[in-house]
Amino acid sequence: MRGPREARRGSLLNEPGLIADGSVLIRDGRVEEVGPTRRVENLKAARGAVEIGASGRVVMPGFVDCHTHLAFPPPGLARTDAASALNAVKTSTARSLATQMGNCLQAMARHGTTTVEAKAACWGGQSAGLKLLRALSLVNHDPVDVVATLLFCLPARGSGPDGAEAAVEWACEELLPVLARRRLAQFADIEWSPEASRLGPIRRYLETAARLGLGCRVHADGDGPAQAAALGRELRVAGIDHLENLAAGELGGVAASGPVVTLLPGPAFHRGSRPAPARALLDAGAAVALGSNFNRSQGPILNMQTVVSLACREMGLTAAEALVASTINGAYALGRASTAGSIEHGKPADLIVCNVSDYRELGCHSGMNLVHLTMKRGEFIYQEGAVAPLAAERLRLAW
């Protein structure tokens, strides 16, 4: 997947950089060389290397899931019940929350994800988000890399402009400085709201986060996504996410914007609603990434293979576009393109071996795990296990 040093757009999304009969030479957890097998195996550095066969399988970069809500309250509570969710977080220990998150990360690793963005929501004036971020810090690199994001949610509509201004005032003066100082998050995200009275607070939040050295994202899952993209382009945010409500006449402005557009086919499939206009965005020149939006209430899918399949079936992406969008473009959305998303010389050896003979088969299956091996920094963190037959005496049925 070598290519330009920027997120892929247009025809480049259909060029995954395939190598037929290829090999990867790994040394000290990093890619030493990648290319045709005949050339790689004749390198002096390859002498004495341990060979791991992958004949008949596809070797590809580990998935980069660039949009999840991994840092959610304990099971059984949705964000719609904000008071109960906040209380549950407050009464839980960071360690117990970390255990819950760690279990999800292990499941992600089994399904081929090696880098994941994880949002911790903060509902204005509450510090529960800090505890969720502390819990995330306990599970980073175990077993995958976690890019922590604070998602700031403005007060409910109808609370008036003063409510939004007061919430952002608190976030800018107290919350964001703590995040930056303690390095609890790499990104600051904010839920988009198109009301004129809220544009000022949203702008202030993003500008303050950028000034403190945090990356910025915009959560545009409601009305007015084109306005969100315009502000994101102006402020040079890293990504604009969701965009399910984007109108046809707004495609050009969004596609021309600098930020990577992260699309989420899972929630639309789960709810039976209309997904974002992915095909139109791609044709208009947008740099598109794919994320799972994993959370228990609205998107209980953490398998990026399923996300790829849904993107092909429900959004009209080609298999190549979905592959690029779920790896290197996801890495660009997270500012991790130098360390994730492709198999290139010098990059960490984050890769997966899949039980398919052609990468295009990834878009033909849904709800399956096609991953045979998952490697993180040159170490296997997951290996597919054999299904052992049961002894005959254990197969006797009792009637």
Where are the regions that the model predicts?
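Metal-coordinating catalytic core of metallo-dependent amide/deamination hydrolases
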Residues: 85-102, 106, 114-227
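N-terminal metal-binding scaffold of metallo-dependent hydrolase/deaminase domains
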Residues: 1-43, 361
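Histidine-centered divalent metal-coordination motifs
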Residues: 67-71, 191, 219, 242
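A structural motif
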Residues: 31, 112-113, 185, 237
